[in-house]
Amino acid sequence: MDEEPERTKRWEGGYERTWEILKEDESGSLKATIEDILFKAKRKRVFEHHGQVRLGMMRHLYVVVDGSRTMEDQDLKPNRLTCTLKLLEYFVEEYFDQNPISQIGIIVTKSKRAEKLTELSGNPRKHITSLKEAVDMTCHGEPSLYNSLSMAMQTLKHMPGHTSREVLIIFSSLTTCDPSNIYDLIKTLKAAKIRVSVIGLSAEVRVCTVLARETGGTYHVILDESHYKELLTHHLSPPPASSSSECSLIRMGFPQHTIASLSDQDAKPSFSMAHLDGNTEPGLTLGGYFCPQCRAKYCELPVECKICGLTLVSAPHLARSYHHLFPLDAFQEIPLEEYNGERFCYGCQGELKDQHVYVCAVCQNVFCVDCDVFVHDSLHCCPGCIHKIPAPSGV
């Protein structure tokens, strides 16, 4: 006995993530189902792409972050707040990559109050900087769903009818402290066509279920960090637009970036309109994007002109939104033993070892599950189909 190497007994070990130790055999014993749930969620998201459906391409989204004392719990590492802010940094980057003509804002609720961390804006750098600074935020008190939703609604209700109005709530607490009847507010949100979705970090809460159901949103409770990221990814694609939403042509301007040098005699320094309501000190600059209608200057696109209201974008912004309207068809799932072709993934060239493979119905090339998800979530086009297109003559 003395010669046995020292090792921690099961009853001496920590209780961290004990649910992942469970296994299930063919007789029906217990098993860790986390990976299976994540796998099914990935595949479900591939099949959920809305083809031939009106989508809210111009999105206005407020993210409400719970800042109550429950965010200091350490079931997510290092704690719920830090994990949430890190995942939101990823979410903001991906959101603007897939929705370049949309805007986002962040609200924090704690101590029965709500305050804006960032205003609605199309500038991802500003949001990411604010999220990095919020890591040092003190979590205390209870959240207030009522105050948070009221604050978001005050801005969203003035958005044009052809845009999507959304709120995503990251809810850690099991309680909410509200100054009035929240069910009356839910009716107001529904009338204003504001879609509210909730991601719970603790357990299902009745008021969140009603809130999501009545406004047409979704409500999920996370299993672990990976599932948390999957649920956030679910909100990157634009939701289907309601049949009652306005359908009209939208005037847009496509300003070119003008660069002037100090040696240019005709160059006139000017202020950027984007600095009017910002915290940064306005400064005189020579170059920028000039609105083709009123000549107001802006530092970056996309933006809505503060003078004439014209939406200013660039052509690549519209091109990157195009894939949502015509999504790539889902690949066919086939058991590996029934597949007679080469046992290598066409995307990563790795050996196919999973129980199922995924075949493109057009080019008949086979992919592993990771490449399948990557193709549908990021590339939005099949590599095999692209390679089969003949090159133009003379190239």
Curated annotation (Swiss-Prot):
Domain VWFA: 60-236
Domain of life (superkingdom): Eukaryota
Entries under SMART domains matching the protein: C1_4, VWA
Record key words, sorted: DNA damage, DNA repair, Metal-binding, Nucleus, Phosphoprotein, Transcription, Transcription regulation, Zinc, Zinc-finger
Modified-residue entries (Phosphotyrosine), positions: 95
Described function: Component of the core-TFIIH basal transcription factor involved in nucleotide excision repair (NER) of DNA and, when complexed to CAK, in RNA transcription by RNA polymerase II.
Name of protein: General transcription factor IIH subunit 2-like protein
Organism this protein belongs to: Homo sapiens (Human)
